[in-house]
Amino acid sequence: MISQASIKSLSDILDLESSNFVRYIQEVAKLRPSRSGDAEAIALFEELYQDSSSNITELSALLADHAAVFPQVSWDMDSARYNFLRPVFLLAPLTDSFRDDIGRLDQLAERIVEAGWEEAQQAVDRLRGQKSAALERIESLAQKLGGLESDPPERSGSSASRW
């Protein structure tokens, strides 16, 4: 029998993946590609988004047998500051987000391991491995494009305050 704690933990992992920063980038942020490197960053974001969608499908299928769970998507209001930026400027926050997600995954996976839920444990291990590989790709692209780009523009005040 699978414990309620492990079901809750897997549900929390589903919520974490559903609220992934790359999903925010693809679904909400209106990116402004304009220079070299932007196309590479956008291609990476699209690939990571597809991976995330596959992960959500897999986790939802595992949970469907045990509970009626729907992903709870929640993005930090602070993420709005990333709207309308060039894609290359989102690589650093995406790196930080993936690092945080991996750490959170490790915490949430403990209850699944303790319960001995083999299928869920394998899914979480795949997700962790996928996120680690993605983190390396993001860092590699950020390093490659880092020399080409300057710091992102600083926003101070609203557009009305600059009139």
Where are these regions (language model features)?
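Iron-associated oxidoreductase/ferritin-like identity signal
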Residues: 1-163
